[in-house]
Amino acid sequence: MFGFRLSVLLFAVCSLSACSCMFVNSCKYPPSQWCDSRDIAAQCGVLEQCMKFNASPVTVSLYYESLCPGCREFLVSQLVPTFIMLSDIMNIELVPYGNAQEKDDQGNYTFICQHGEDECRGNMIETCLLKALGPKAIPVIFCMESGADVLKAAQPCLGVYFPDTTWDSVMKCVTGDEGNKLMHQNALKTNALKPPHEYVPWITINGEHTDDLQDKATNSLFNLVCSLYKGEKPAACGQGLKKRTNSYCMN
């Protein structure tokens, strides 16, 4: 895939003008190394193209609760559909915790969740899924959050996407020390937000939260990601995906 994209880059540069192609032909480096450094790219006449080629993906972090209606709406109608269409230019970070409270009992943590014990269990299941599966957990969590009952959907959703991952292995994390420590890390990450979160869903873009970014993300995350990406826009950005989310769970 990397070689193919560089071949496309070479073709594009040579198509610009005969002069550009002569510049490339005088380059001392093979095409596979053109974008290895800014100096090499400049010497080979492809600096602008390499800057687009090497553009960092937009990172969208969602601080949320598994049973918060507004969180579920944003995740199901905005976040995951946008990721499906723009996965080449976008990363997702999910942090299930939200407006929960944590109590430390000599290194063993207990949690009080805004929507009760079921939400604490949902948060823990999704946290353990993320630990076990990494980004591949996203469709499982989407399946859970789009169901009528998040908790009842968890095991069937896992079975659909990862039949080789046992439910017992997930529950071992949920009920054990591993899940407890993972949720503590979610608490630390949420409580370290600057500015502090006031509600959920709380969205950061490349680690930054502003009222303007939050409003744009909930109005059309798709358009926001396309507008912020510094590289060459994928064809999907010529389309649109809009559905405003204005429901929040206040802290």
UniProtKB/Swiss-Prot annotation:
It is found in: Secreted; Lysosome. Highly expressed in spleen and kidney. Also detected at lower levels in liver, heart, brain, intestine and gill. Keywords: Disulfide bond, Glycoprotein, Immunity, Lysosome, Oxidoreductase, Redox-active center, Secreted, Signal. Residues 22-60 form the Saposin A-type domain. Induction: Strongly up-regulated in spleen and kidney in response to bacterial lipopolysaccharide (LPS). Its EC number is 1.8.-.-. Its main location: secreted. GO terms for cellular component: extracellular region; lysosome. Lysosomal thiol reductase that can reduce protein disulfide bonds. May facilitate the complete unfolding of proteins destined for lysosomal degradation. Plays an important role in antigen processing. Dimer; disulfide-linked. Belongs to the GILT family. This is Gamma-interferon-inducible lysosomal thiol reductase. It comes from Carassius auratus. The gene is ifi30.
